Amino acid sequence: MLRRALMAAAASERVRDVVTRAPGARAIVNRYVAGESSEDAVAVARWLRSAGLLVTLDYLGEDTTDAQQAAATATQYVHLLGKLAAEGLTEGGAVEVSVKPTAVGLLLGGGTSPREHGVRVATEHLERIVIAARDAGTTVTIDAEDHRTTDAALRIANSLRSRFPTVGTVLQAALRRTEADARELAAPGTRVRLCKGAYAEPLAEAFDSRHEIDRSFARCLRVLMAGPGYPMIATHDPRLVDITRSLGFALPEGSFEYQMLHGVRPDEQRRLAASGAKVRVYVPYGGDWYRYLVRRLAERPANLALFLRSLRSKA
């Protein structure tokens, strides 16, 4: 119930105005967001790499219906990749980028669901980013958003992967369709990130309880880990980390990776990396941090309590 209410708040402009102006908001945001500039993102990536961690960077922003903004977001990624390459951070895919299709034009053409014009624009911008990533020695993961964009996002990823095989895609265990998608994507060389999902979805499309989502995650995890692809297991849940570790014992070294969010269980990230596991940290940056913050609060109620205490103390 609390999680669904917070997800609804992520879409509320009134709540957004209150939260973004709150004196305690910035301190909480700084735990999870690298900063607002590409220089901030590069600095955090450099720091994480020095600790033996891999990185994926996400320029915050989504649901754009402005063609110029979509193009500007693509340009931001291209410039970021150039800066990362200049510092030697992209070698071997050590630092890659994650891109939300709606940030680069998927919803252009009107409405809340993708249309052909938006799919075409997003594909063109994503191809530009993928080429820049390839030239920098790294790759791109096409992020997942709410269920209305899933078919279009997978279609774009499949199209790009036919020419750029390292392009990754993301599946959300909260969606009822995901186990079938996992079976289809468990193919040689396919990079698939499995996460729980962080969007408010209708019950017809998604599981509602944490227990159901966890069970779905475990089923999808087993499908991906048994396949010939490259699973990227995005979870902080100790039980799911343990299941992943158990399934990974029989696999060749380096054939899968863990992924965790910047600022969430950093000690566990380093512990896993020190044990020899590949661990990639998902690092967002940019000024459009509100929805990202709300999703993090929804996932971890303790963070919500901390945030509310901070607001009261600084009011």
PLM region spans:
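Positively charged, amphipathic and often flexible ligand-engagement surfaces
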Residues: 1-315
